């Protein structure tokens, strides 16, 4: 993947963006400044994958500019060809916390819809903050649990849509009136 350094984001802008997030919003100015200083900014082209489902990850991302799409491959599809849309990510959204905090492989693929500038925070950048303020992990855990819940709701909604489409197709095939 061709990450391009993005030098048009100032340290103050990075700090402000980090402060606006649910994960890092409760950090003090000094902690935000330290994290902003260590974090890198990259530019990604439209259609480019930022993370791929199944890969290991040791960083999380914050969207500075652009829109991204989250996809999850079904059990019977290839992870290089995401099959199911999950959600959009926009300015101030974060992603990648799950792989960063659990050491598990990425649970979804994230692809740029437009040109995107992202702040990348690596595990090694978080360690000093976690030692100083371990409750950050609780916040991240809450965010991850909420995302899992949303994903489950999306999956249930998708399954219901497929069920209704199948019933409608069967009704057409047998020329039966459709129930309202």
Q: Where does each model-flagged region fall?
A:
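Cytosolic regulatory regions built on CNB/CRP/Popeye-like sensor folds
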Residues: 1-180
């Amino acid at each position: 993947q061709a990450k391009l350094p993005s030098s048009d984001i100032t340290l103050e802008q990075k700090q402000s963006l980090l402060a606006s997030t649910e994960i890092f919003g409760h950090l003090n100015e000094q902690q935000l400044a330290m994290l902003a200083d260590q974090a890198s900014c990259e530019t990604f082209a439209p259609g480019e994958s930022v993370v791929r489902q199944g890969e290991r990850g040791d960083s999380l991302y914050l969207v500075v500019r652009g829109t991204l799409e989250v996809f999850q491959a079904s059990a019977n599809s290839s992870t290089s060809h995401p099959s199911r849309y999950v959600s959009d990510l926009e300015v101030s959204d974060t992603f990648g916390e799950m792989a960063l905090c659990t050491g598990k492989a990425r649970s979804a693929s994230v692809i740029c819809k437009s040109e995107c500038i992202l702040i990348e925070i690596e595990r090694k950048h978080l360690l000093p903050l976690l030692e100083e303020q371990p409750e950050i992990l609780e916040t991240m855990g809450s965010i991850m649990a909420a995302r899992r819940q949303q994903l489950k709701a999306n999956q249930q909604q998708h399954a219901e849509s497929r069920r209704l489409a199948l019933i409608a197709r069967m009704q057409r095939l047998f020329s039966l009136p459709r129930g309202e």
